Amino acid sequence: KASYIFNYRYSTTGLLNLEGGTMDYQDLNLKLNFPTRKAGTFSVWGTSLIDKFTSDFEKNTEKWDYWGDRSESRDKQYMAAGGVSHRYFFNNDASLKTTIAATYSQLDGGATLFNHSMESTPYMDLDSKYTNLIFTTTFNRKFSNRFTNKTGFTYTNMFYKMDLSIAPYEAEPLEIVSQGKGNTSLISAYNSSSVGLTERWTLNAGIYGQLLTLNNKWSVEPRVGLKWQATPKATFALAYGMYSRMEKMDVYFVKTKSTGNQSVNKDLDFTKAQHIMLSFGYKISDRMNLKIEPYIQFLHDVPVMADSSYSVLNRSDFYVEDALVNKGRGRNVGIDITFERFLEKGLYYMISGSWFDSRYRGGDGVWYNTKFNRNYVINGLIGKEWMLGRNKQNILSVNLKLTLQGGDRYSPIDLEATMNHPDKEVQYDETKAFSKQYSPMLIGNYTVSYRINKRKVPHEFAVKGLNFTGAKEHYGHEYNVKTGRIDVSDNSTILTNVSYKLEF
């Protein structure tokens, strides 16, 4: 029997006037299933979103304290993905799943500065488009209760077009930072097996390989894991794996003033990592689980800037404007602990904590904290459901999530360099990269929903509150033109989203 799911969402933030700008978000998701008697099951799926944000400049020049007060910006993001999948089950405990898909993303952004005469000059302009055509297939075969093998292949053809220009200083012409147009391919394949050595020991082993045709860089990555069922309630596991990744497409096409039209990063290799992880799981009861997972990760061949603390491991901006080399390293050490109680009598809860240390070595050979080295993240989640209605068919649900995490990392301010900058743009002492840290953050979210389960058309009302604790996000620092001081740039965004959903 064929089935389908269709979901459209429009965020109520589009109806709000946020301070200094507007935000608009909407998305669409669908999936159609068509089972057949002899030819397997066909599925058609799709997802898309539109995300827009505009920031207005302050019209009253007497209120211009910071550079951002006289800046007007736009940020429009469009994304879509869709495909057709086919799954076929053979008579010998084997299955084949094949998918043909396409993805598309576009980012249109820009910033304009105004002077006291209300004359505007462009400061940044960005237009990037990415399209991926994907073919992937996976063959799974269960040879016995103790031996299963999976083989997969993926071919991704990536089309790209990007144009990014930035003015080096205010009122100067825009200069090309990153530009490229063309296509390349990423080819990957893997084979993995799960072998039950005994009733208590299970071995998982496999190998993964990939090739980037842009520069013919390739990698072969072994992965292995061993699991021991020590008792009916306790399990231990040890796993090792090698992983690699390509960079975002814009990195490969950076152009600098010294190289002219030549893209300086086209020959970058994959960033590679070695993972080692232990795992202990304990089933306290049918409804309660405890899991403890210490791990260590070593990264190498990380793209960095020569003789600098810069590394792509800290990248948060949407562009890179420098020549890079694969000489960086990284190291992550930590432990994850999770305790969860599954839903019973309408109640569930989970407590998890992560303690970690994340460091990297830049192109100058010095080890630093990574930008994301918060050191700890603690999550608490609790929810309660009540069955209501004449036949107890409706559900009132209340959920609460609290997150306590270490503050963002940042580099010390280089006051002299900042004051000497023509635009007083804040400069940082990169020889002490990310050595400072903001205060811890407490983030709270909640959801209250009421689901009415009608026979033909179930529907649901929901109210979601994001960051009701008022935690502040930090965006760096800004020079105050009135006081002559450098202030922290932060913002606390508290959102309440009301939604209504129909299922048919």
Regions found by a protein language model. Name each.
Residues K1-P35, S43-T47:
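Predominantly transmembrane beta-strands of Gram-negative outer membrane beta-barrel pores used
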Residues F6-T12, V44-I50, T98-Y104, T151-N157, ...:
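Transmembrane beta-barrel strands of outer-membrane/channel proteins
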Residues N33-D51, E72-N215, Q229, I284, ...:
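Face-selective signature of the C-terminal outer-membrane beta-barrel domain
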Residues K59, Q106, L164-P168, T213, ...:
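Surface-exposed extracellular loop regions of Gram-negative outer-membrane beta-barrel proteins
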Residues N132-T136, V177-Y190, N265, D269, ...:
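Outer membrane beta-barrel strand-and-loop segments of large Gram-negative receptors
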Residues S144-T148, T154, V177-L299, S352, ...:
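Structural signature of Gram-negative outer-membrane beta-barrels, strongest in the C-terminal barrel
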Residues I296-F298, Y319, A323-G407:
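Gram-negative outer-membrane beta-barrel transporters
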Residues T403-E425, S439-N445, Y450-F504:
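C-terminal beta-signal and adjacent terminal beta-strands/loops
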